[in-house]
């Protein structure tokens, strides 16, 4: 069963960063507001109300279509998708069906076996339903309340072909797509629930299972990994994989059966009678795209001389790329190393975004590193103190202030030499071992000097200096 190919396709629902809803003038700034206070007769579907299309949402969707190399249809139309669910107050959703806004695009990712083209089947506009609030655990709630503030928020749904071959590839695709949408300025990934994924997964030759409403990038990889294992185990026991819809319980890292999988005819699609077809041919040429992640990555390599791996990391999000360009002026290579290899690790550990690090303080820290005022170890300590202050809601000290307060400046050459002589006098057994050819003794002696200077010397330089002094004594 291990050799059965994994086949994955994704349906990604992205909330567009507009100020008003898809078909009415209600504000989209509904988070942290009282339930059911951002509604009107249109988004509640009350009798006699008439929808009107949000022009900005169409422009945003066209941008996404062009960025993903799609064919833009000259004419598309809205349809009603009919089904009953508590958070769907009209008992139908206005979406697009057989005439989507854009289709047949592609997105290049770093796949499991090198660069890979993932085909985009279609991109269409639709409205978000309301939000069900389960009182209790998600899969065993005592009862459910419904908040319609989210009903009518503009969405684009991006549907891929089943081109992904592992949960890891699926996450890579989502990361690349998220970055692209951020660069287009049509999507805010930091807003709760702004991206939700339905994942279709099967093992070659078996039925397809849909895992619905996964709300995080990590969650997609976890849900798909669980499903691969579950389906392989079923087949190994001689059982069949049932075609069904499943729900991902993120807290437990498992999927649970929800219902049998619907067919398209279950939704009884028909054209939305209250909206005219969209004719966008005259708009498409006027849509200008900004610099996208791949182009910025190539520019970072050519303009700043950073490595391809660092360039890929630094262009993985719009805010991160802008942060790097803000701090890179003095020494681009040093800034790339410390942003990609040190800062991001500390931010991820604290579940912080790049906004948590004041760029002026990071520039000052880079200056101290470049001028050889502090060691890398001290620089990491300063970085952590700054981020811990931010976490505690305090104003962080400037790096130079921290250096002065904690005495983190590098120990001078004369001081290091004096400390080496002290260690040589104190550690005769280790000296004898060194002269006997036991090179690990040198590492021990370096460690003793580092203790004396409290880590405020460069270990590489110290190793060389100590070896020179010992070799002269032979």
Curated annotation (Swiss-Prot):
Top-level EC class: ligase
SMART domains linked to this entry: GatB_Yqey
Pfam families in the cross-refs: GatB_N (PF02934), GatB_Yqey (PF02637)
Key word Cytoplasm present: no
Recorded catalytic activity of this chain's protein: L-glutamyl-tRNA(Gln) + L-glutamine + ATP + H2O = L-glutaminyl-tRNA(Gln) + L-glutamate + ADP + phosphate + H(+); L-aspartyl-tRNA(Asn) + L-glutamine + ATP + H2O = L-asparaginyl-tRNA(Asn) + L-glutamate + ADP + phosphate + 2 H(+)
GO molecular function, one term: ATP binding
One GO biological process term: translation
InterPro entries: Asn/Gln-tRNA_amidoTrfase_suB/E (IPR017959), Asn/Gln-tRNA_Trfase_suB/E_cat (IPR006075), Asn/Gln_amidotransferase (IPR018027), Asn/Gln_tRNA_amidoTrase-B-like (IPR003789), GatB (IPR004413), GatB_C_1 (IPR042114), GatB_Yqey_C_2 (IPR023168), Gln-tRNA_amidoTrfase_suB_CS (IPR017958)
Record's keyword terms, sorted: ATP-binding, Ligase, Nucleotide-binding, Protein biosynthesis
SUPFAM superfamilies in the cross-refs: GatB/YqeY motif, Glutamine synthetase/guanido kinase
Assigned EC number: 6.3.5.-
Function text: Allows the formation of correctly charged Asn-tRNA(Asn) or Gln-tRNA(Gln) through the transamidation of misacylated Asp-tRNA(Asn) or Glu-tRNA(Gln) in organisms which lack either or both of asparaginyl-tRNA or glutaminyl-tRNA synthetases. The reaction takes place in the presence of glutamine and ATP through an activated phospho-Asp-tRNA(Asn) or phospho-Glu-tRNA(Gln).
Family note: Belongs to the GatB/GatE family. GatB subfamily.
Subunit structure: Heterotrimer of A, B and C subunits.
PANTHER family: GLUTAMYL-TRNA GLN AMIDOTRANSFERASE SUBUNIT B MITOCHONDRIAL AND PROKARYOTIC PET112-RELATED, GLUTAMYL-TRNA(GLN) AMIDOTRANSFERASE SUBUNIT B, MITOCHONDRIAL
HAMAP family per record: GatB
Name of the protein in question: Aspartyl/glutamyl-tRNA(Asn/Gln) amidotransferase subunit B
Species for this entry: Methanospirillum hungatei JF-1 (strain ATCC 27890 / DSM 864 / NBRC 100397 / JF-1)
